[in-house]
A protein has these predicted regions:
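C-terminal edge strands of extracellular/lumenal beta-sandwich accessory domains
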Residues: 518-525, 577-579, 608, 617-619, ...
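Subtilisin-like serine protease catalytic core
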Residues: 176-177, 195, 260-346, 362-367, ...
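Surface-exposed beta-strand/loop patches in noncatalytic accessory domains
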Residues: 117, 121-125, 608-646
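Bacterial N-terminal signal peptides
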Residues: 7-18
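Secreted peptidase-domain scaffold signal
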Residues: 503-505, 513, 517, 534, ...
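The feature captures the short pre-catalytic strand/loop hairpin that immediately precedes
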Residues: 430-435, 457-485, 566
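Cellulosome-associated attachment modules in secreted, modular CAZymes
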Residues: 508, 695-759
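Autoinhibitory N-terminal propeptides
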Residues: 21-266, 271-272, 340
Length: 759
């Protein structure tokens, strides 16, 4: 038996506490399902009490000490259920098996297995340390007695409704007309959707669409029928559906497309991408040689899509100043938005995206640009979750207009984590950045505090093709509808640069599509090298400019001092992957950027990040910088602080870094859902871009310690972890040379084939 005093002594011995900390409080150990142990304690630092936990499995040591809180974070309310729990008007039926289960630690695979053994099923992740689960009453009674369960309570229908819909019920609003609703079920596929569809029909409603590869459906319902549907255990969340809505010579110069990149031959050769809009004038002279390839149909108004397509792919025929970013593209693709279920069509967006990235299909696109979206929202909606779902599954670099509301009302697609959301500014028709200002583009942050937009560009005075005739142009296309295809075009150039070996050790496959980096890597490169405006200039706060304006001239200039992890290193919970870099004296900046794809968030939750990977950088003198800390109010990171537990994009930017060894850490703070489905373990992959290292080449296959040589030190590092798999604390993602989740004979073979060589 472990006494409280023994627990205290163990925790003090294992975990090094900050110098300013008092001895830990409330220290205890709890047994986890299987053979694991969790250590729980709290520390008082600066007068503030902070709870922590750490987990050990079997005979392995304890992993990272994770700071935590015990708040159930719902859109409906945030509460500590041991102190207060809401009693909503729309309460769960006593027969409902939907429950919130909160633990003392993050969600572990052992918890999921234990719930399944009781006849239950984990359906969705909630924060902090909680799940939505379907558990029969007998199983719930057992869970309440488990030491690793902190609280279990009902998941009420009130938690499933968009705020405006809930207000109608609570305020007894009568005569609400029938509407089309977007309904998200818990489980992927048609099984639950068809159960809900049958109930919709029995209530006199009409099913608008189902999504076989996804979890979202649409139905027209009366208010009374909606109340019945939201009470079903198959239903996770409901919000209102709405139809599709719409939201250049200087733009090419300011980001380096001309004259620098065009002079080097980067004008889109080999690049294939899609513009997703309403309709397009197929016969425009600027769209010939090659002609547009349609992704199925071309229906709807052609005015908006003609301009957005031209900004990306136009060849400048009849007006050279209106040339697009990729005039020499291999293939421009156009898709009409109203063919997909999000906008009233028959095709799920999952299927549409799968077709784009099918290596054996006709499109083979490396990016998509969308300047259309669903009606404005301040929230992470069922549509936002659907976007994160298909982009997580199919790894497409997708750019989405934030919109033009003048406030935080934005396209719900832009609130997705895995998309590149694009804001806008007024350049005043000059190349002088000092006169640029924000005007009316929608801005962030997202409802949960995540940084949006990601990037921005011109939203005024963009010269581009128009739909009036086959030779017509307009001089003042505007809005984030203009900014988004500009940014997408720059991504197209980045894919070409990658393919042609601008970044040593990357690219070089048969085609741009075959060479392409992961979408996270492209995003990390573009965000790291973007031009960041002074946050005091013209209303261009962090929430309005995001991480800045694409600057591929800068990216090209820094190419030889850039280290890249292209989702080739894996990480599991409680593990840290560590990288070291020698920074020469006189280096102007040291920048580290972490981006990871995340499974779709839970619309019911007030926190939409699922997994939590954190970035930490340590200077030669020991000063630590946490990702994003200080960057809301400055373009440079502040030392100290704490981990960012909401964003899936993290940066550390340091001006005039001290010469010497800098350490970059990627920490697996919380991995509760599989982020790297190619391996059977619960793990995640990520993109990491570090700019400011010395000129020596590092990071070729087998160079585990990143010193530019594959030698005895690297072989020793691999052999010390040989036989481990991702999920074990001793696993080292840098030694998993083929990124298959296991350090084995295949990795040793890669090492030996490179042994004795340099990078």
């Amino acid at each position: 038996m472990t006494t409280p005093r023994m627990s205290l002594l163990l925790i003090c011995a294992v975990f090094a506490l900050p110098a300013a900390a008092q001895p830990p409080k409330s220290a205890r150990l709890i047994e986890l399902p299987g053979s694991g142990t969790a250590a729980l304690w709290s520390e008082t630092i600066g007068g503030v009490e902070q709870a922590y936990y750490a987990v050990a499995r079997g005979r392995e040591p304890f992993g990272l000490a994770i700071p935590t809180t015990h708040v159930v974070r719902l859109r409906y309310a945030e509460f500590d259920p041991l102190h207060e729990a809401p009693e909503p008007g729309l309460m769960a039926d006593p027969a409902s098996e939907l429950r919130i289960v909160q633990f003392f630690t993050q969600v572990l695979p052992e918890y999921t297995e234990a719930i399944e053994a009781l006849g239950g099923r984990v359906l969705a992740i909630l924060h902090d340390n909680a799940v939505i689960a379907r558990v029969p009453a007998t199983g719930a009674a057992v869970l309440r007695s488990e030491a690793w369960v902190r609280w279990i309570g009902p998941f009420h229908p009130a938690y499933k409704l968009e705020e405006a819909l809930l207000a109608e019920f609570e305020q007894l609003v009568l005569n609400v007309p029938e509407r089309v609703y977007s309904i998200q079920v818990f489980e992927r596929g048609l099984a639950q959707q068809e159960v809900v569809a049958a109930r919709v029909i029995s209530l006199g409603g009409a099913v608008q669409c189902l999504t076989p590869p996804g979890r979202r459906m649409e139905a027209r319902l009366s208010q009374a029928a909606l109340l019945e549907i939201v009470g079903m255990d198959e239903v996770q969340f409901v919000d209102r559906w709405g139809p599709v809505e719409t939201d250049m010579d200087q733009a090419r110069v300011i980001g380096g497309a001309v004259p620098l990149l065009s002079g080097l031959g980067f004008t889109g050769q080999g690049v294939r991408g899609e513009v997703f809009d309403l309709g397009v004038r197929m016969s425009h002279m600027a769209f010939r040689d090659p002609n547009i390839v349609l992704h199925v149909t071309n229906t709807g108004s052609i005015s908006h899509g003609t301009s957005t397509y031209g900004i990306v792919f136009g060849n400048g025929a009849a007006e050279p100043l209106g040339t697009g970013l990729l005039p020499n593209r291999q293939q421009g693709i156009f898709a009409a938005a109203n063919q997909v279920t999000q906008f009233g069509g028959p095709k799920p967006r999952h299927d549409h995206t799968a077709e784009l990235v099918d290596p054996n299909g006709p499109y083979r696109a490396v990016f998509q640009s969308s300047s259309v979206g669903s009606p404005w929202s301040l929230q992470y909606t069922t549509v936002s979750a659907e976007v994160d779902d298909y982009l997580f599954t199919y790894d497409l670099l997708s750019c989405q207009s934030q919109s033009n509301s003048g406030d935080q009302n934005s396209r719900p697609q832009a609130w997705a984590k895995n998309i590149v959301a694009v804001g806008g500014l007024d350049p005043h028709n000059t190349l002088d950045r000092s006169d640029d200002n924000w005007n009316y583009a929608s801005y962030g942050p997202a409802a949960d505090g995540r940084q949006k937009p990601d990037l921005l560009h011109f939203n005024e005075d963009v010269l581009c093709p128009s739909s009036s005739s086959d030779t017509s142009y307009q001089p003042n296309f505007n809005g984030t509808s203009a900014a988004t295809p500009i940014v997408a075009g720059y991504f197209g150039l980045l894919f070409q640069m990658w393919h042609e070996g601008v970044y040593p050790g990357h690219g070089g496959a048969a085609t741009v599509f075959d060479s392409r980096p992961r979408s996270t890597t492209a995003k990390a490169l573009m965000l790291s090298t973007a031009y960041r405006y002074p946050l005091t200039q013209g209303g261009l706060t962090r929430a309005r400019q995001g991480w800045g304006m694409p600057d591929l001239g800068r990216a090209y200039d820094e190419r030889l001092n850039t280290y890249i992890v292209d989702e080739t290193h894996l990480i599991s919970a409680f593990v840290t992957n560590t990288y070291t870099f020698n920074v020469p004296d006189g280096t102007p900046q040291f920048r580290a950027t972490l981006v990871y794809r995340d499974p779709p968030g839970t619309p019911n939750s007030s926190v939409h990040r699922v997994n939590n990977l954190s970035l930490r950088v340590v200077a030669p003198g020991g000063q630590a910088y946490w990702g994003n800390f200080g960057l809301t109010s400055s373009n440079w990171s502040s030392p100290g602080g704490a981990a960012d537990f909401r964003d899936t994009v993290e940066h550390v930017f340091v001006a005039t870094p001290a010469a010497g060894q800098w350490t970059v850490q990627v920490r697996g703070e919380e991995i509760v859902q599989d982020g790297h489905v190619q391996t059977p373990q619960l793990d995640a992959s990520y993109a990491l871009v570090v700019v400011g290292k010395g000129p020596e080449p590092v990071g070729c296959p087998g160079d585990i310690n990143l010193d530019g040589q594959v030698d005895q030190a690297d072989l020793g590092a691999l052999l010390s972890v040989f036989g481990t798999i991702v999920g074990q604390l001793s696993y080292n993602g840098l030694a998993d040379l083929n990124a298959d989740g296991a350090i084995d004979q295949a990795d040793l073979g890669i090492m030996l084939s490179a042994f004795g060589g340099g990078c």
